[in-house]
Regions:
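C-terminal segment of classical bacterial N-terminal signal peptides
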Residues: 14, 21-27
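A generic structural signal for short, solvent-exposed coil/turn residues
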Residues: 17-20, 79
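Sequence context surrounding c-type heme c attachment/ligation sites in exported
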Residues: 26-67, 75-158
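Bacterial N-terminal signal peptides that target proteins for export
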Residues: 2-17
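Conserved catalytic core of two-component sensor histidine kinases
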Residues: 71
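Short regulatory "switch" loops immediately downstream of catalytic or recognition motifs
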Residues: 1-2, 90
Length: 158
């Protein structure tokens, strides 16, 4: 019989992770303008959502934790974390971004920097992880980073 986890922080971690994955996938499923910058950043974030989904599945079912797969997904995020930010330079390439990306560029840059930091920390932690418990805090930080940026800089969709 499957073990039911009632740990409140674990439930929050799973919720944040799933929300980040859904937001990432939603960003890519909406109509993209014919702007290559919009397409590039949405493609990148869809890939991030896919990686978060793989790791999130392990978070939901810790007995399925596969250290090699988790390590691979975490390394991908860390290596790819700097990729989309240059595609936000043109304020005409709006896509699902809010005007705050450009009007509050310093805070947006801080969010991007934080994402790069927490994905690097997750990747480093994953290198020696033997269970989901080992990576849970770092994984939660990545999910929180996604959520924070999407809350402030992603247009709400209906």
């Amino acid at each position: 019989m499957a073990q039911v986890y009632t740990n409140k922080s674990f439930k929050s971690l799973v919720s944040i992770t799933l929300m980040a994955a859904v937001l990432g996938l939603t960003a890519c499923s909406t109509s993209t303008e014919s702007n290559p910058d919009v397409q590039a950043r949405q493609d990148t974030m869809k890939n991030w959502g896919d990686a978060m989904g793989v790791m999130g599945d392990m978070a939901k079912a810790p007995d399925t934790f596969d250290s090699e797969v988790f390590k691979e997904q975490a390394a991908f995020l860390a290596e790819d974390a700097a990729k989309p930010w240059s595609h936000f330079e043109d304020p005409e390439a709006v896509g699902n971004a809010t005007e705050a990306v450009w009007s509050n560029a310093d805070e947006f840059r801080a969010e991007a920097d934080n994402f790069q930091k927490v994905t690097a920390e997750l990747s480093a932690t994953a290198q020696t992880a033997t269970s989901m418990d080992d990576v849970k805090p770092a994984f939660g930080q990545v999910g929180a980073s996604c959520k924070s940026c999407h809350t402030d800089f992603r247009a709400k969709t209906e």
